[in-house]
Amino acid sequence: MARKAKAAKKSDNGAKVGFEDTLWLAADKLRNNLDAAEYKHVVLGLIFLKYISDAFEERHQELLAEVEQGADPEDPDEYLAENIFWVPPEARWSALQANAKQPTIGKKVDDAMVAIERDNKRLKGVLPKDYGRPALDKQRLGELIDLIGTIGLGDKENRSKDILGRVYEYFLSQFASAEGKKGGQF
């Protein structure tokens, strides 16, 4: 166990950051009757949403502390100036996690993706929006949202270490293995 924890901390040299295996096991368990080619979009979309929500929330807290100096935490330009996507209230991770146990969680995630694309033109047409489909078990989707919610992805420290890129790389290799393909063949 100590050796495993030690290996997980070696994140500055490109090694695993420590939580990918946990996420992968959850994703694999939660995927239910979907194959890896379909489920990768579900998982990677949620990871991206958590990443931008974390970055947004960190900047939001900074702006709240600077209100007396004229900062406006509800002005999207305050975020864009720092290369952070604006995340509308209904699309913030906290709102999704608060509804993770609801049978409508799939629709709420779809609506969050639509809202993010609406307010961030650079993301228009890019985000997955099929979380409400019947084949996706909503209870398991909620469990995955809760699990991803325990991991900090988009704060400044993790952004500087390219955590998102490393998590995506890890997941793509795992999805490729699950499909019996080599990485890059998606």
Residue ranges with predicted function:
Residues M1-F186:
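Non-catalytic, mostly N-terminal accessory regions of nucleic-acid modification and defense proteins
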